UniProtKB/Swiss-Prot annotation:
Ranges of compositional bias, category Basic and acidic residues: 164-178
PROSITE patterns: PNPLA
GO cellular component term of the entry, any: membrane
Protein function: Probable lipid hydrolase.
Keyword Transmembrane recorded: yes
Record lineage: Eukaryota, Fungi, Dikarya, Ascomycota, Saccharomycotina
Gene source species: Yarrowia lipolytica (strain CLIB 122 / E 150)
Protein name as it appears in the record: Patatin-like phospholipase domain-containing protein YALI0D16379g
Ranges annotated as spanning the membrane: 223-243
Subcellular location: Membrane
Amino acid sequence: MLKLKFRWNKPDDGPRVKRQKSQQLTLDSPEGSETSSRPGGGYDNDRDVNGTFKRPWDITKIPGYNQTYVNEASLDKFAAYLKEEEVPVESSTPVSSEEMLPLEPVQKEYITSKHDWTPVFSVLKNNNSVNKRKMSHTALKSDFKHYLDMYDKEEKRRRGKSKKDKEGSEGDKTKTKEPKELVRKSVFSSILGVFSIFSKTKDGRKLKRDEIGEGIGFWLMRWPALFFIGMWLLFLTTIYASVRVLVAGYENILTWRGKRAKLRKVLRGARTYEQWVQAAQDLDVELGNAEWRENPKFGYYDHVTISKLTKMVRKLRLQDQAEDLSNILQGCIKNNFAGTESSTLYSQTYYGTKKVVEQWNEELGKAVTYVLESPKIDDEEKRDLFRLYSKNFGKSALCLSGGGCFAYLHFGIVKAMLDQDLLPQIISGTSGGALIAALACTRTDEELRQILVPELAYKITACWEPFPKWVFRWWRTGARFDSVDWARRSCWFTLGDMTFKEAYQRTGRILNVSTVPADPHSPVILCNYITSPDCLIWSALLASAAVPGILNPVMLMNKTKSGDIVPFSFGSKWKDGSLRTDIPVDALNTYFNVNCSIVSQVNPHIALFFYAPRGTVGRPVSHRKGKGWRGGFLGAALESMIKLEIRKWLKFIKAVELLPRFVDQDWTNVWLQRFSGSVTLWPKIHLADFWHILGDPWPEKMEDLLYRGQQCAFPKLLFLKHRMNIEKRIRNGRQATRHRKRKLEETDVCDLVRKTFSESDPDSDVKHSFVFPALMAPRSAGTDISSSNSDYDHEPQWEMDEGDSFLTADEEYPTTIL
């Protein structure tokens, strides 16, 4: 059975290696084309016995397939900043901390990560000042050898003195000037200094493990307690896995039989959303879920209020009572109004919800459009109304989690939403998910539709290196991948040196990348066009993917107005955002008023614990018409109890700091942070995917990833459709009303000027000349990035057309006499 299960991976091992080697060569070529040796597309050995290609893979259909968008000058600067060395230590002679005096920091144009936030000391020894900001391993070894030599000399002197004392001799020519106690103390200090290597970070800062004084009890009980808790967690995890296997067997044996099993197979085999909808409706009829939709009564929403408001809004719209309708909408357009956006309403059927809810959503959308187009409401009032609608209703965001190469499943999620025109304007990504988010936010809709195809695998070449090469790098640097090489290969996804601000101006989508500072006590930053508008996107992608042991922390790079590339945030280094904020829901709410988060979660250590005891959106409980529990009440209760017990002990380990800070990181956050959103998508992960968790996909694999991602997104699209139906109408209203600011007529300007001068000097008979400039024009939507605490919609500012002037008539234009 195992042989059959993994057999489909074996034929692709050869082509994948060949593809990686060819891409490594063609990427450095001037043309950057990856298909020069394969004009017909496909792998070189993907041919049948007749010599024809098995699959017609054609990379030429992808826009910019022959471009790399690499700016070598930027990469050279990036590499130079990463390799910048410290001022060498002039003397390796060790000095105690009491002999160190504070020294003013060296004035530099910027602060690099190697001397960021680190105290500086001046070591005074023989009137020589030494910058002992960081002592390398070589210096420590030299000090250790120095003290060993001193100790050997002292021992020889002592033994020689004892021998001569017995012989009655006087004096000792080899007598040292240094006291015996000082030498022994220095040797002991040097030994401690050598062992302190393991308690230092990479930038030389010593980890203070006992900063708050844990006491001797902590050191005695820490490791035994951690051992017993770890064994208990291992036992609980084993029991949890057994419960999940029993629940899956229970559902497959008792529920999915006969016609139900056939309909379920058709549902899972749907390649398009239309096919999936038809299969879902057939399955609902078979399971008896269709009857639930007709009955408006349900305890998870206020069906009485919704029914009354639907009739009232329709009546006011048909009677053309715009003022009354706009007042009612102010109270109705809110997030999850009367429970109509509750996920439970969409978890009872495979497709659809209550008919009353669908009618309300349709009527509400028509009412919003009617208010926008009604001539009975002036433009100023419309602008205020839609500003309130936007704030009350909020915004939606797509959050793509990390997860190594599992993150390529996000491609299918984005494709499914894009095909139905439901892709949110705000997209965030972390680690591997940041790469997909960057691709979605730097390309237009039409470009994305051409890019999200199986041939996209030819452009993903991050893991091209052979085993001996990356093992040697890992042994030498502590990281499997090279930062500069990854920066070069990610430039295609970011269109070169594009910044967050430039991406927003090009597509109107807001890219967010979560990164964590290398300092464990500094706050996390969510990079976007507000917090870091001029930051290069490819540098944020590297920082967000810098998992310890995989990629070393890197600096964010900033583009100046002159086009120069310099370090961002004083040159401090950043690492994988999944370590602390995989899903930055709170930050998105702060910056963009996001209150509906659609999360695509592919982290394997989190996805294995996903379990919806009462069903989830588009996936109801498979028995008892959706009214029961998955696996029965006993199975669901046991699953929840074990999972809560595991979480409790993880919180205990974090609270009492039992887990060591390996590579200066609190690893309990990997399990204890928030990983879900308003709606959470869990793409299906196969056991064979773990073998390629740090590997590049090939076209057949990419085709499967796109299929699985779309299959996961299909059940959630109806919920997202109802949400975006209102949100997009409000967004269109905001864009339309902000461009309807009344343009001043010449008579208005004359009246204003007359009033101003009459109030300032009523008795003056002096006539003034005035030039009326051309009408001011607004910037196009999506180009302004101004923001304020009171408005998250970033209204475009007004500016004058080129050539307009406020010069008087005597200087340039004919006068207008008032």
